């Protein structure tokens, strides 16, 4: 509710993944508590898994109710309380999750739900002596600000706070010339445009060999022509409104840069309408320059930028992909050539924390694909695994 999600995206998030996090985090906690050191004859060694000394500040984004479930449940299962600041653009859905917790019997004061101004709340919370940690999902800029505030207040705290964060990405799809064009096109469309591209894992840039481009392009354009854009109440609408006017304006500013540049061409979409809601057409940009701004910067909207490379420059373009963006969250390689898959995996080892073969870079499942990346994408603490609870 209030997130601009159609029924299909809502079911994936606010039903299935919420339940998965609750169930799996309980299971992961039990594994952690059972892990004990060996004891020699006549002695007993024991690990006491004590909570951090204080409370955890959890800051959750607008795009996934499930993330709020994970950030709070992982903390309280390990014995800490939370001060929970939900995104101001998704208060309603998070409020209902809080009410469900209370109806289920969660004691008062375990999760403390505090919607409001992020800067005002953080200014109080991050100066508190009992702050023991921060569990964050959101923008890179906000995370950097919080980290700096924590650093500036180190003399205040009882202990060094543990900081865990996931901060977005500039996620890629990379195709080798042995790739299957229809599979590749499907990954581009679904990976870039589901939930209007408002996923940390959403595909935002693609590298396609020249020999594969025309047939892939025809599939992509056909699929986009069949996409309907509109209100979430009409289940025929695959693409719905972006979260707010600020997001709309930011997305359209990137599209405008492509419209006015001789280094890029828009081959699909490119229009937006905020007369009633904030709707942006699924947009595909072909960049002549691999360092064009929409290839490098996170947009967080339904915009995919494609760079077409010469087939004989596969390894050179892999290196280009690795070095183009400061992020390192998700990515995928499409190839039927095992050597190419292995080569891509080695070159792009640090370019993605979640790396997929012949699949779109979105849709990590709790317990199956632990989620998180490094570089500017965060601390790589792998949500959906026991590592996120430690």
Give residue spans per PLM region.
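Generic beta-strand/beta-sheet core signal
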Residues: 2, 10, 25, 59, ...
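ALDH superfamily catalytic-core signature
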Residues: 100-105, 127-128, 133, 140-290, ...
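Short, solvent-exposed loop/turn elements at beta->coil junctions and helix N-caps
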Residues: 42-45, 269-275, 361-362
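Conserved C-terminal structural/oligomerization subdomain of aldehyde/semialdehyde dehydrogenase
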Residues: 106, 130-131, 186, 222-228, ...
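Long amphipathic alpha-helix in the N-terminal Rossmann-like dinucleotide-binding domain
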Residues: 3-33, 46-47
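Short beta-alpha connecting loops at secondary-structure transitions
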Residues: 82-84, 170-174, 201, 205, ...
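Buried hydrophobic positions in well-ordered alpha/beta secondary-structure cores of metabolic enzymes
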Residues: 22, 56-59, 79, 111, ...
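Rossmann-like NAD(P) dinucleotide-binding subdomain of oxidoreductase/dehydrogenase enzymes
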Residues: 31-183, 380
